[in-house]
Amino acid sequence: MKFGYFCNTTNWDHKPYDQLLNETKEITTFCDENNWDSIWYTEHHFNHEGMESCTNPLMMGVDAAARTKKIRIGQACNVITFHNPIRLAEDIALLDQLSGGRVDVGIGRGIYGREAINMNKEADLKDQAKNFRLFDETLTILKSLEKKFFE
């Protein structure tokens, strides 16, 4: 059995963001030093209520790679409908190199309408079929980038 920590950076108390990030860094270091198998960061935007305050799980992963030695680093998840697939693949590959191959990739379509409409109008969750087509197209591109050539 393997154990991972889902680092959901909630901020119900409305702490200063730097304090929230420092606490997240401490949790990351603790998990690595205490032999957890993985740590997972979220991607959420525009959450003024204080929940899920991490906007970029890949950037959190870069910090984790620099401060840890063995823990695997995951994203729960990269909302791929918000991103250019080629740029996202490059960022994931760079994190994997910087971490010494410790990256686990998690992907999703998004859950909050205000995120989708502001990050990519094409990902509007009011049209689930359109959102899913965008997800499928982006996933196809991401998978094809594992190869040397793609169409």
Label each residue range with its predicted role:
Residues 42, 76, 106-108:
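Structural motif
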Residues 24-27, 61, 76, 91-93, ...:
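Short, flexible coil/linker segments at or flanking structured domains
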Residues 39, 73, 103-105:
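Hydrophobic residues within beta-strands of alpha/beta enzymes
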Residues 1-67, 71:
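N-terminal beta1-alpha1-beta2 module of alpha/beta enzyme domains
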Residues 2-19, 81-151:
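Flexible, glycine-rich active-site loops centered on histidine and acidic residues
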Residues 33-35, 76, 150:
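Alpha-helical hydrophobic/aromatic positions enriched in membrane-embedded helices and signal peptides
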Residues 74-82:
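Conserved strand-turn element in the central/C-terminal portion of the radical SAM core barrel
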